[in-house]
């Protein structure tokens, strides 16, 4: 009887859900960057070039997932597939990493990218 009780205690203790504090300001900033790119690519809304490039840089460096967008003399995606792959990667990253997305994490990611 004692063994079963101990096994149940260990089982229930190991099933605790992990809670985190989500920094809504940073999550909203991340989503705003995605929405800016989405506005330009899906809705053909004119966006400021610097804002577009800043959003690409932010998302790429914070997530560690490089963009397939062009940003030399012209900017944007060569095709819809590249755009969709980037969006899926960045949105997937956000869903998996909301707990670690803090101001210090973002600042660190951006400072190592632009020393």
Tell where the protein language model's regions lie, with residue ranges.
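Residue-level detector of alpha-helical secondary structure
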Residues: 27, 31, 38, 87, ...
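Compact alpha-helical subdomains of small soluble proteins
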Residues: 55-115
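Post-signal-peptide N-terminal segment of Sec-exported extracytoplasmic proteins
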Residues: 33-66
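Sec-dependent signal peptide recognition
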Residues: 1-8
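Alpha-solenoid helical-repeat scaffolds
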Residues: 20-30, 42-53, 77-80, 84
């Amino acid at each position: 009887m004692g063994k079963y009780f101990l096994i149940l205690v260990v089982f229930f203790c190991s099933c605790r859900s992990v809670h985190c504090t989500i920094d809504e300001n940073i999550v909203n900033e991340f989503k705003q960057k995605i929405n800016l790119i989405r506005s330009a690519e899906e809705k053909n809304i004119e966006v400021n070039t610097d804002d577009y490039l800043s959003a690409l840089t932010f998302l790429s460096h914070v997530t560690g997932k490089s963009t397939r967008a062009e940003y030399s003399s012209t900017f944007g995606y060569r095709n819809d597939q590249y755009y969709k792959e980037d969006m899926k990667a960045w949105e997937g990253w956000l869903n998996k990493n909301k707990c670690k997305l803090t101001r210090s994490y973002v600042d660190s990611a951006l400072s190592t990218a632009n020393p």
